[in-house]
Swiss-Prot record:
GO biological process per UniProt: translation
Description of how the protein assembles with itself and partners: Component of the chloroplast small ribosomal subunit (SSU). Mature 70S chloroplast ribosomes of higher plants consist of a small (30S) and a large (50S) subunit. The 30S small subunit contains 1 molecule of ribosomal RNA (16S rRNA) and 24 different proteins. The 50S large subunit contains 3 rRNA molecules (23S, 5S and 4.5S rRNA) and 33 different proteins. uS9c binds directly to 16S ribosomal RNA. uS9c interacts with translation factor pY (PSRP1).
Listed Gene3D superfamilies: 3.30.230.10
UniProt-recorded name of the protein: Small ribosomal subunit protein uS9c
InterPro entries per UniProt: Ribosomal_Su5_D2-typ_SF, Ribosomal_uS9, Ribosomal_uS9_bac/plastid, Ribosomal_uS9_CS, Ribsml_uS5_D2-typ_fold_subgr
Major subcellular location class: plastid
Subcellular location: Plastid, Chloroplast
Region (Disordered): 185-208
Composition skew (Basic residues), residue ranges: 194-208
Keyword Transit peptide annotated: yes
C-alpha cells in the first residue's frame, strides 16, 4: 500500500497546536517615595534625660546637724566631760560619754543604727549595758570610735558604756560584772611566723 507524500503533508497541515504558555504575570503598582534630599532633613526630637536628686546631700546635712547637736551637748569636747569611759577591743578604741537624756545613741556624729548598718548583733552589743540596768531611755550616749572594724568597735563601745556607768554609781558594778560587761576581751589576731603561711599554717610537706 503506497502512501503519497502529498497526502501526508495535507494531513499534517490539518493538525492544530495549542500553546500552553502561561500568561505574562501582572506587576503590582508600587507607591513612589519622595527622593531623599539633604536640603530638607527630617526633624528629630531632642533627647530629654531626667535625673532624680541623690540622697547624699541629705545624709551630709543630717550628719552636720548631728555634729552641731553633739558639740552643743559636749562643750569642750569629749575629754572635758565627767562621765566618760574608754573601751578597747582588738584594734578598736571607743570613748563614750553619758549624759541624762532620752536614749539617743550617736556614734561619730551618726545615729547608731545607721553607723552599725542595722546589724542586730552589733546593736545588741552597744545597748546591753544600758538594758542590763534598765537605763535605755534615761541617758544619751555620745561615742567617738576609731580603728578596727564595726564588730570590734561595737564591742569596744559596750565596754566603754559599762565603764562610764560605773562613774554614775558604784552600785552598778555588781550587775554589770555578773553579765561580764566589765571584762576586757584581750583576744587579738595571732601574729604570722616566719617559714609559715599564716600564724600556724605550714606549707605542704613533701617527703620526696
Amino acid at each position: 500500500m503506497a502512501v503519497s507524500i502529498s497526502s501526508l503533508t495535507s494531513s499534517f497541515a490539518s493538525l492544530s497546536f495549542t500553546s500552553n504558555l502561561t500568561p505574562k504575570p501582572q506587576t503590582l503598582p508600587m507607591a513612589r517615595t519622595k527622593p531623599f534630599s539633604l536640603s530638607n532633613p527630617a526633624v528629630v526630637k531632642p533627647l530629654v534625660i531626667t535625673a532624680t536628686s541623690a540622697t547624699a546631700p541629705v545624709e551630709v546635712a543630717e550628719t552636720a546637724d548631728l555634729e552641731k547637736f553633739v558639740k552643743s551637748r559636749l562643750p569642750g569636747g569629749f575629754a572635758a566631760q565627767t562621765v566618760i569611759g574608754t573601751g578597747r577591743r582588738k584594734c578598736a578604741i571607743a570613748r563614750v560619754v553619758l549624759q541624762e537624756g532620752t536614749g539617743k545613741f550617736i556614734i561619730n556624729y551618726r545615729d547608731a543604727k545607721e553607723y552599725l548598718q542595722g546589724n542586730p548583733l552589733w546593736l545588741q552589743y552597744v545597748k546591753t549595758p544600758l538594758a542590763t540596768l534598765g537605763y535605755e531611755t534615761n541617758y544619751d550616749v555620745f561615742v567617738k570610735a576609731h580603728g578596727g572594724g564595726l564588730s570590734g568597735q561595737a564591742q569596744a563601745i559596750s565596754l566603754g558604756v559599762a565603764r562610764a556607768l560605773l562613774k554614775v554609781s558604784a552600785s552598778h558594778r555588781a550587775p554589770l560584772k555578773q553579765e561580764g560587761l566589765l571584762t576586757r576581751d584581750s583576744r587579738i589576731v595571732e601574729r604570722k611566723k616566719p617559714g609559715l603561711k599564716k600564724a600556724r599554717k605550714a606549707p605542704q610537706f613533701s617527703k620526696r
